Amino acid sequence: MKKLLCSLITVLALTAFAQDTNVINDANATVRSLSGSFTAISVSSGIDLYLSQGNEESLAVSAADQKYLDRFKTEIVNGTLKIYYDNKGVTWKSDGKAKLKAYVSFKTLQKLNVSAGSDAIINGSINADDFNLDVSSGSVFKGDINAKTLTVDVSSGASINISGKSEKLKVDVSSGADFKGYDLVTDYCDATVSSGAGVHVTINKELNAKASSGGDIHYKGTALIRDIKTSSGGSVKKV
C-alpha cells in the first residue's frame, strides 16, 4: 500500500513536467526541490534530459539503482541549472547502464548546454526571444525551438535534429557534427561548417555561408546568397 501511494504521489508531481497533462511514466523518478530560479541548463555525464516549458519550474531525477542518486547532482549556480554525475574518486563510465535521467520543467530558458554524451529531448516547444544551444562531444539534441534569434554550436560528433522557426539563425558546426534542420525555418542564416561536419537548413531570405575542410552546407527555401566562402573541400548546395 505504501509503495502504491508513493508511486501515485510521484506520478502526480511529475505531471508538472508536461506542457499539457501528459504523465511521465518512470517508476524510478524522484522529485527534487530547486534552490532558486534558472534561465539556463547544463547537462553532462551521459544523462538523458527531458524538457518541457510550462508555468512552473520543477525537477525530477531517475536512475536504475538508488546507489547512483547520491552522486547524481543537480544545482543552480548563477542562474544555471547544472545536471551531472559526480565521478570524483570512483570509476565511472557513462555507458547507459545507470540509466540516468532528468525531467525539467521551466518557465523561461535562454541557454542549453548538452555535453559528454548526454541527450536532450524537448516535449512540446521552447519559446524564447533569444536562445543559445550548445551541443558537443557525441551528445544529441532533438526538439522544436521558436526564437527571434537562435545561436547554435555543434561540435565533436554531436547531432542536432531541430524544428521550429527563427528570424535569425547563427549556426557553427565542426568536427564531424551534424545539424539536421530542414524543419527549422529561418529568415536569415549565418552558417559556418568545418572538419567533415554538416548543416541542413531551410532559409527564406538570406544566407551567409562558410564551408571548409570537407564541411557541407545544404539548404532549402527561397534565400538569396549574400556571401559564400569555401575552401579545402567544403561545399554549399541548394537542394
Feature annotation, model-predicted:
Residues 1-239:
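Intrinsically disordered, low-complexity terminal regions
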